[in-house]
């Protein structure tokens, strides 16, 4: 007899007792054990390799019907039957246990404690746009410190940035929160969605402080490189389990790749003591989006564990195609941003290589294999800038000196797999 830990009944807190009678070299026995393992159910296995013992067992449980095969499965002392009988009630079992897509009847016990931890960490890093000081940015902008080419470069990025955060926020409210009803998960997603609203207001404040007209908020529609990005970020079909899983994967690319190209291009100015208020917005946003990517990656893994039947070679292929699509869209946007000329300290080719690097990191976070084979960060200065509070020779007003309620940590985490 062998056993794996029994699983809590998520609605009652009781252990679900699973007993599987098997024999050696039984493919369906292995399938049954694998199903319980994949969905987090513990079980006890009883081997019936002795034929006489097995026949006596069949007779004992027959109860008026012929029983001639293994596995034979019992749950809480109730005879379920064979592997096929298990598959017939598999969705019911998952639903009984609660799961990601079921309402939580009680606040505790927590069934996804990682989501509670991520939400707490995210809230400790809370900030609002009113905390920003953009006075030096205005002086840089109007005083000649920012060249005409740099201004057009920044404007092209800001044209899209606010709308990108609108798209990400809408995806939480429209695609995910209605589907994921577990309380811990909803609290996490709700926290993420609310922070996207702060991002929108922060970048809008930057636009307005620099004197950009309201027309810039819809100017992105005039550029296919921008409009195509927004359309791609919004496109999803969450009406099926398969579609919902793919939408979760895309959310990791939306926040962990599409936004990061713009982050890098704007953060480069921080290296030269320019646009330091903008640098604050970018750094705080990077911290937020890195937490969002972590949470959504873990949610994706939990989802495919609970609904493992959606995962096949075609499902994986679609995610790899998604990663290629996001890189292609970013390449076109980067070309547009650099259309007016080069930028001090950051070549277009470097940004494109970085996008491939960060996309591979996101694939790893999803449990996939790297697709672009860029193992080293092509922009090593990022770590120096993002960890600026540790460097005494950095300019005086370092953005990473900002801390609120434990807003501290290693910036390398933003780029870790």
Name these PLM-found stretches:
Residues 2-19, 96-98:
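N-terminal leader/targeting and pre-domain segments
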